[in-house]
């Protein structure tokens, strides 16, 4: 679970997602927003996992119940961030939609997690109507850059995602350098 934030513009951000993330992240982005809906607007109950363990679940009393994903990774910093403010939620939605479009551009297909997009366009009813908060940097400390999640996530791509970084039908981002030629990296 993460939010790969490589550029302020969601369309450019999606273009710079590596292939693996263009495939994987739309579902995670939809899960993050679904979790916000369930936790903020739903009623908590104890459910069972496939292994018969107790698990907290949230039931919605409207059409969202059958459309949205189940709550997931509720205490992850990215999940907390999405539900902290309506501005955060809308930023996540724009990233999600741009990544869905990028998937179609690269692979010529509609991503499977497009289904909840119409429902997710509306934020949870009970989300705080406050300004956005800083995006969490969910990565090793060596990649983090204080007050700059964009540079931090670019570092993260270079340091941690180098072995499988590829961009189908896209040029490599100009900021992307190969890890083996990197001497030191910017950080704070």
Segment roles from a protein language model:
Residues 1-75, 79-188:
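Sequence termini and other peripheral, non-core segments
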């Amino acid at each position: 679970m993460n939010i790969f934030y490589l550029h302020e513009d969601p369309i450019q951000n999606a273009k710079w997602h590596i292939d693996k993330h263009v495939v994987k992240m739309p579902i995670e982005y939809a899960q993050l927003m679904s979790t916000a809906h369930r936790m903020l607007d739903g009623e908590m109950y104890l459910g069972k996992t496939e292994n018969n363990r107790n698990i907290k679940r949230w039931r919605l009393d409207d059409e969202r119940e059958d459309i949205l994903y189940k709550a997931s990774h509720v205490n992850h910093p990215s999940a907390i961030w999405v539900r902290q403010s309506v501005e955060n939620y809308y930023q996540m939605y724009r990233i999600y939609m741009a990544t869905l479009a990028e998937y179609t551009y690269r692979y010529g297909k509609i991503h499977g997690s497009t289904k909840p997009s119409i429902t997710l366009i509306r934020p949870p009813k009970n989300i705080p109507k406050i300004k956005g908060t800083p995006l969490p940097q969910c990565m090793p400390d060596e990649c983090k850059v204080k007050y700059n999640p964009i540079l931090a996530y670019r570092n993260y791509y270079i340091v941690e995602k180098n072995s499988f970084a590829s961009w189908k039908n896209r040029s490599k981002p100009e900021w992307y350098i190969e890890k083996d030629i990197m001497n030191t990296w910017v950080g704070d």
